[in-house]
């Protein structure tokens, strides 16, 4: 069953808020901007992550140095799952952020 538009937006908003909290709680100098539903995270080394919502597809998209990734929400596991690798968003972010920022983050629950 497909997500309703309202549920989709609620889930993306909740996910972006969790991401902001995780990055805010770090000791790193990270700049974040959330504008029109797009969350941009800029690391000290100039690399960035961009999280955007694709409403028609009901997907959360992630742009990173290593590429672009599309996530569908899995109601059963209550997690965003990559539509290609089936990796959970949190697991993928732990790997990507370590590659880009050179530090480890805990994205448990995403």
From Swiss-Prot:
Gene Ontology CC terms, in alphabetical order: cytosol
Provide this UniProt record's keywords sorted from A to Z. Iron, Metal-binding
**InterPro entries according to UniProt:** CyaY, Frataxin/CyaY, Frataxin/CyaY_sf, Frataxin_CS
Q: Which Gene3D superfamilies match?
A: Frataxin/CyaY
Citing just one GO molecular function, the answer is: ferrous iron binding
UniProt record, GO biological process: iron-sulfur cluster assembly
Q: According to its UniProt entry, what is the function of this protein?
A: Involved in iron-sulfur (Fe-S) cluster assembly. May act as a regulator of Fe-S biogenesis.
Family to which this protein belongs:
Belongs to the frataxin family.
Protein name per the record? Iron-sulfur cluster assembly protein CyaY
**Per the UniProt entry, what species is this protein from, by scientific name?**
Pseudomonas fluorescens (strain Pf0-1)
